[in-house]
Design a protein with these regions (language model features):
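N-terminal short beta-loop-beta anion/metal-coordinating cradle
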Residues: 2-110
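Internal, conserved structured core segments that host functional sites
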Residues: 101-130
Length: 130
């Protein structure tokens, strides 16, 4: 287990987590996977994606991409929805489901950050602390 020394002054990732639901969880399992060079054959993201679908996890938060990506290298996609053009920005989603034994399952799935890794790590710790 990795422990990172933290204080109230070091919780600079808090403002980057956008909660749509803020559940209080006990004994939760947290799984995170990110696309990128370390996701050989998409093994990690496929596994976490499968578990997210298997346990019907619903989105409870996102990590704001603005601070963590160079959008010249991780480009948003554009799509048409009816007569309107929509931009889909890269996103890291936090989802919540329930395991067969009743424990909460929290998954984080998205794109490996390109910038501000320490701040991104603090944002993940914010999710884990909840």
């Amino acid at each position: 287990m990795v422990r990172i020394a933290r204080s109230a002054d070091s919780l600079f990732g808090v403002e980057h987590v956008e909660w749509s639901e803020h559940p209080v969880l006990q004994d939760a399992v947290l799984l995170a996977a990110f696309t990128g060079w370390n996701d050989a054959g998409d093994a990690a993201t496929e596994a976490v994606g499968y578990l997210t679908r298997r346990y019907e996890c619903r989105r409870i938060a996102t990590i704001d991409p603005e601070y963590f990506y160079d959008f010249a290298s991780v480009r948003p996609s554009v799509r048409l929805e009816g007569d309107e053009r929509r931009i889909d920005w890269p996103v890291n989603e936090v989802r919540l489901g329930e395991l067969d034994d009743g424990r909460p399952l929290v998954t984080v799935l998205g794109i490996e950050p390109r910038l501000r890794w320490r701040t991104f790590s603090q944002a993940l710790l914010t999710v884990a602390d909840q």
